[in-house]
Amino acid sequence: MQTLYGDAWVIGGIGCVTADLPQGNDLAAVKRHGANHGCRTCNVSNDQYTDPNYNYIKNARFQQQTNERIAEIESQHLRMDQDRLATKYGLIKPGPLNDLKWNQHLQTPQDAYHSMAGKARTLLEVTFNIFNTNGENDFLEYWKRIEKPSHWSRMPNPLRHRQSFMFSDVLRLAMLMPFILQRFLESCHIKTDALNNWHKNSGIRRNLVASKLCACWAIEAKALKLAFSTTMTENTYQELQETLKKNERY
């Protein structure tokens, strides 16, 4: 492979490349996650990320397919045509590891940590955005009061500073959310337009929205707990599968 100091002969093998988002996509020659096709293991479009019926196995990315598409992109004479195909396939110029014999999709897997924590962050954002002023005030009051493990670092106000939260902060807050919401949340804490939208789109009565949201967070916290268990048995895996299916229904 070519290096800054000339050609180098690399002997050895790559088992699995561990990379945080979005650098993992760069290594897999896939556009980043905000693109139309930003998943490095399948061809899902960004408007189908939350579709539970999407067949990600049938639509998986394969090394030979990706190599053919990259060759097709590079064969275009006009930059405009190259950009069009790159957008269509969700691909970028291959990185340095592509000179090695490796499978950029299987050996650069999506990691559960960022997938699960990113989902929890989105749910936090949606939840906080539907609170009215009373909801925000009461949430802060109970968030300050709730018991937290002594070894946790102090978290700033999540309503005002959640954008600066690290994923570890997001996951900790996610574990507290079911208990905080259960202690205070009622329909009067939720914006009227959010209640109306729930009723219109999902048929949920206004007086049931709060309990539905609490149940959603309870399932989310359980899924996170199972996904990051220190040991994973067959029973744990099955329970996680069932919990994630319940999560999809919410």
Regions found by a protein language model. Give the residues of each.
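Terminal interaction-prone segments of large eukaryotic proteins
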Residues: 133-250
